[in-house]
Amino acid sequence: MGMTRMLLECSLSDKLCVIQEKQYEVIIVPTLLVTIFLILLGVILWLFIREQRTQQQRSGPQGIAPVPPPRDLSWEAGHGGNVALPLKETSVENFLGATTPALAKLQVPREQLSEVLEQICSGSCGPIFRANMNTGDPSKPKSVILKALKEPAGLHEVQDFLGRIQFHQYLGKHKNLVQLEGCCTEKLPLYMVLEDVAQGDLLSFLWTCRRDVMTMDGLLYDLTEKQVYHIGKQVLLALEFLQEKHLFHGDVAARNILMQSDLTAKLCGLGLAYEVYTRGAISSTQTIPLKWLAPERLLLRPASIRADVWSFGILLYEMVTLGAPPYPEVPPTSILEHLQRRKIMKRPSSCTHTMYSIMKSCWRWREADRPSPRELRLRLEAAIKTADDEAVLQVPELVVPELYAAVAGIRVESLFYNYSML
């Protein structure tokens, strides 16, 4: 009160001045209260917005399962137990001895595997072999794929290899994913035992369909519109399954789909899904061909199952053109600029308007505007009812792998049969 009188130069007997003083206080106090309220409101709004952005980075658009938190597989033992082994103080042998009980149900006795192993290629973890597994009936051995861990392997490599096996345990079985038959992990060398999908990858199948060949090894090498939908539906079922597990694939393409003789499709190449499972995100060190990536992936933004939907549209293009590279007129390094201009691929001459409409829905710029895998599957199931199952897709030109690799932006070596489950 004294300071206010001093500012207004009031005397105690000056009633008019005292009135002015009180009016001044009436103005100042509410103003201060309003200012403090606005500051607090601003801080609360800022905290709320920051939290919302954090949640958006952890999940995709509405209806998309959130990415699971990173998992430390070095401590997981299954059966509700933990393996508490500090890596710096543990040998490979001790680590295997501690983790093998957790994988007991998956162990395949090594004597059940044939002594002669046929090496078919090299994978990211080590050599990949084809072998026969004893099923109890000597007349019916089962052909399997052995993914070996390259030697010598350090403790971290062993931990990662076992983590991939644990990843299969988490996934469980699905008819449109390559199945884990078991493992051999009680001692070195370590093997992951997978089912053998002997017909190879879909891209090679599509290229063979271009040749004037009716059958080869009992498989009919031709493709109709209805069969394209049939294969696409199976891929979407696999993507739905991954979405239910709070995962996404990250590299949907014909080269990552294996085919059986009855045209059963099995999605493979789950290395990126494994990264999401263990780390909660995709590593920046993974190299994926740019022409299959959704815009948000090219812009290095958080990815989701809707990025797989974009790639699925590219897969439909691959099938209907019998394995042509996407965006043939665009250099791989210019694909982002091309897409930023809202340009998409034109309808191939062998593609119906119905199928092209489905493709375009996959290539919407905003991921929230794209259909979910389930919505896509329902559209494919509706299209199958009226699809042509008589006319065979025909492309007269044969594929030159070196030219394809240059246009597609991939390594030529990756075009050779590579059983890449993980």
Curated annotation (Swiss-Prot):
PROSITE patterns: PROTEIN_KINASE_DOM, PROTEIN_KINASE_TYR. It catalyses: L-tyrosyl-[protein] + ATP = O-phospho-L-tyrosyl-[protein] + ADP + H(+). Widely expressed. Highly expressed in brain, placenta and prostate. Undetectable in most normal lung tissues, widely expressed in lung cancers. ATP binds at residues 120-128, 147. Keywords: ATP-binding, Kinase, Membrane, Nucleotide-binding, Proto-oncogene, Transferase, Transmembrane, Transmembrane helix, Tyrosine-protein kinase. Disulfide bonds: none annotated. Its EC number is 2.7.10.2. The chain crosses the membrane at residues 26-46. This is Tyrosine-protein kinase STYK1.
